Amino acid sequence: MAVGKNKRLTKGGKKGAKKKIVDPFSKKDWYDVKAPAMFNIRNLGKTLVTRTQGTKIASDGLKGRVFEVSLADLQNDEVAFRKFKLITEDVQGKNCLTNFHGMDLTRDKMCSMVKKWQTMIEAHVDVKTTDGYLLRLFCVGFTKKRNNQIRKTSYAQHQQVRQIRKKMFEIMTREVQTNDLKEVVNKLIPDSIGKDIEKACQSIYPLHDVYVRKVKMLKKPKFELGKLMELHGEGGGTGKPAGDETGAKVERADGYEPPVQESV
């Protein structure tokens, strides 16, 4: 190796030393995430997005963003095992307006329900709401001991399982087919569908822990801003002003002429 100065080191110093460190958060903005009006707590939190630069618009980066929120945070409630998915459909100012996108039970709740000495019955069905949303609902239920039962196990016969599954199909289909998405979500919040199934199946075999464990959004109708604004309780969004903004005729005295202005 030749003895001498290393030109690279003396000329430019260390490689990459001149690079200016830019804080990535300086190019981003915070947006508020708003839940639909069927939930008690509307303000979910905030989300980050890169500011509008040239053809890259900030609102386009927010649309389609999915947030998973516990029902306890949405309803200010103790029941925390149900999670709702909300998708951003439109951006108004600094607010992201969301809509229902799915529901799920937490992993620990599902694991706590599965036990020995009982039969687990599951069913799923694809149903369309009156306003054109195609949902896939998954239901789960477990058999329980009868009041006067001494035997340790409470296994249902195959025929009873089929009858219970049929009831699950019927009730889930009926509850969703006859309602729009808003009413379906209002039924999912207290899980009234699961309670109806439990009540209807008592004559076949007593059940407990009956839940709609998951809801998937399969298809959506064409996006309409008016419907989204209705979900958020902000009117129909027809584009007309809120007050009566029509002009009124002004009465003036005969021979009235406007004063001549010196400068315009």
Curated annotation (Swiss-Prot):
Region labeled Disordered — which residues?
233-264
Q: Which PROSITE patterns match?
A: RIBOSOMAL_S3AE
Instruction: Name the GO terms of the biological process aspect.
Output: ribosomal small subunit biogenesis; translation
| InterPro entries in UniProt | Ribosomal_eS1, Ribosomal_eS1_CS, Ribosomal_eS1_euk
One of its Pfam families is Ribosomal_S3Ae
One GO MF term attached to the UniProt entry: structural constituent of ribosome
* UniProt keyword Membrane, yes or no: no
Subcellular location(s) of the protein: Cytoplasm; Nucleus; Nucleus, Nucleolus
Does the record's keyword annotation contain Ribosomal protein?
Answer: yes
* Family according to the record: Belongs to the eukaryotic ribosomal protein eS1 family.
> What is this protein's function?
Component of the small ribosomal subunit. The ribosome is a large ribonucleoprotein complex responsible for the synthesis of proteins in the cell. Part of the small subunit (SSU) processome, first precursor of the small eukaryotic ribosomal subunit. During the assembly of the SSU processome in the nucleolus, many ribosome biogenesis factors, an RNA chaperone and ribosomal proteins associate with the nascent pre-rRNA and work in concert to generate RNA folding, modifications, rearrangements and cleavage as well as targeted degradation of pre-ribosomal RNA by the RNA exosome.
Protein's name in the database: Small ribosomal subunit protein eS1A
Question: Which gene does this sequence derive from?
Answer: rps3a-a
